Amino acid sequence: MTGRQFGSARAAVVLAFGLMLALSACDRPMESRTPWVPHLERMDEALARNDLPTAQRAAHDAFVATLITATWEGKIAVGQAYQRLAQHPEWRAEALKTARREYLDAFFLARQQGSLDGLLASAAGFASLGDRAVVDQCLFFARIMAVRVGGDAPQRVAAWTERLAGTGASARMTESF
């Protein structure tokens, strides 16, 4: 086998392996597609027992799980979890900082994945933090995506804009970041 043939064979094997991984993801049970969920359940159970160190460890484990899956859904879920941790004064500042970072990651993943739902969920996350400027930016990009998607997407964005304006988040969307 020549070097060129070997290179072609190796490329074919790599391509086949990649295709196999992609197809197997569709057949995986929901738990393996949402590996952060058990950690968040453990966090909530620990919070209910007022076991703050275990809750923090579980939240961190969920955070790590979202690094592996790289989905906006996981980032939103972990951001919300860190907001629950922020209800405890000793972790408030760090937890809110982490929640904000998770919502920002969710925003960029949603844009990359072409997910209008992800952009809207990111906007809601920032609204819950009171970050009006970033809510505006999320909704700005949601409007752009809604025009591309068509259908009822523009109406959905308008409804979210109105809903988030009711939370104190601004609805001005004139410039991007």
Question: PLM features: residue spans?
Answer:
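Terminal, low-structured helical/coil segments at or just beyond the last alpha-helical repeat
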Residues: 148-177
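Short coil/turn connectors between adjacent alpha-helices in alpha-solenoid helical repeat scaffolds
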Residues: 44-54, 85-97, 128-136, 172-173
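Bacterial N-terminal signal peptides that target proteins for export
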Residues: 2-13
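Eukaryotic all-alpha helical interaction scaffolds
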Residues: 46, 59-66, 106, 110, ...
